[in-house]
Amino acid sequence: CVGEVSAEVKQLLKTTKESLYKAILTAIPGKRLGDIGYAVQQHCESQGYGIVREFVGHGIGRTMHEDPQIPNYGKQGTGKQLKNGMCLAIEPMVTMKSPELYMLPDKWGVITRDKLPAAHFEHTIAIHHGKADILSTFEKKKKIEGHLY
């Protein structure tokens, strides 16, 4: 633990995490990429937060970052249609206020231009049997290990 955070930061974290799960619930066959982004955007912006637009979720497969790109904003019913067999990294990135970012001189670190906190949660999912299955959870690992011993 790195210390306590303010109630405002706790709410930012809670809202960002909630938006991740709302997006995951949206990721079913027949829906579209815009539906995922809309779920994140609507939930976060309705509470006054900003949505990072420079970084997005993505497909994942033989390589870490594959198409399609999955923005955390969007219009319902737009974008590529979701199908069984797709593996996606959904990763809401949400700011306390302004969504504008600044790249640090090291070309790795990124901060918000207004220097206020931001939050990022991520899960990798596989769409199959008509629903999104979360792959990046320790529950899955526990189930696999349980079968090994």
Task: Describe the function of each predicted region.
Residues 1-149:
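Active-site neighborhoods and metal-handling regions in enzymes and metal-associated proteins
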